[in-house]
Design a protein with these regions (language model features):
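P-loop NTPase catalytic phosphate-binding loop
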Residues: 1-109, 116-178, 195-197, 214, ...
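Glycine-centered helix-coil hinge/cap
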Residues: 142, 188-191
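Short, charged, surface-exposed secondary-structure boundary motifs
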Residues: 182-188
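Conserved C-terminal "switch" segment of AAA+ ATPases
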Residues: 192-208
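Structured C-terminal subdomain patch of bacterial secreted/periplasmic proteins
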Residues: 203-230
Length: 241
């Protein structure tokens, strides 16, 4: 298991590193417009967590079937489009099993891409929409002690996406790119600071609802390694079974 914190972002003004662990930051909300670097950072974050938590299991719910995640298509724990509901129910079963057991579990890391699109699609059926929101809310509220962690990426993290105020349970909130005033209020509701203009890969992060910090995503180019690392935690290649 991981013993030291992970350097995940660069604090620009202080010239320091922003470090996290799954204990200190169990859940992550990543937001920003198209082209802001959400997907790139999401891949980077998942890979860094996998490198530090060797026993972790990863689930990817990729509702839009983003080309950046398509290379995971043959892996057991990757779900896209309407199959995301299948994956979420599988995750919920694991989560409920952990709630009634006291053993020391290895981390379960769930990445949900474009949550707003997934909920919008299932809004035609209130029962399905409510089920999604209920599962996510329960994990956000009770997942930490059972080592179940959610990373959510969405362009618009409106409170209506989350049941029972569950959005407040994200301990790591990152807004990439130039957020609208409304977008800032959604993830940094208590801050009235003036935000700097943010180019690709730059934005603001708040840990535990503290004042946002101006940050940059570390530069990296070895995408092959990132994909290889994540694949080791995705439950196996279905084509090899």
């Amino acid at each position: 298991m991981m013993k030291t914190s992970i350097n995940i972002l660069n604090a620009i003004d202080d010239n320091k590193k922003i470090s996290i662990t799954l204990t200190s930051c169990p859940h992550y909300l990543i937001t920003g417009g198209t082209g802001s670097g959400k997907t790139t950072f999401s891949l980077y974050l998942i890979a860094k967590l996998c490198l530090s938590y060797k026993e972790a299991t990863v689930y990817i719910l990729d509702f839009k079937g983003d080309e950046n995640f398509q290379r995971f298509n043959n892996y057991e724990n990757y779900f896209s489009y309407t199959d995301c509901m299948i994956g979420l129910k599988e995750i919920y079963e694991i989560f409920n099993n952990r709630l009634i057991n006291t053993e020391d579990f290895s981390p379960l890391i769930i990445f949900i891409d474009e949550l707003a699109s997934m909920i919008s699609y299932f809004s035609g059926s209130n029962s399905e929409k409510n089920k999604i929101q209920k599962i996510i809310a329960e994990i956000l509220m009770m997942g930490r002690s059972k080592k179940v962690h959610i990373i959510t990426s969405t362009q618009r993290p409106d409170s209506s996406l989350f049941a029972n105020g569950a959005r407040d349970n994200y301990t790591f909130k990152l807004g990439l790119g130039n957020l609208s005033s409304e977008g800032k209020k959604m993830i940094f509701p208590s801050s009235d600071m003036l935000f700097k203009k943010c180019n690709l890969g730059y934005g603001y992060v708040s840990l535990h609802s503290n004042e946002p910090i101006f940050v940059g995503v570390p530069a990296f180019s070895n995408y092959k390694k990132i994909y290889s690392v994540i694949k080791l935690h995705l439950g196996g290649d279905k084509n090899k079974n």
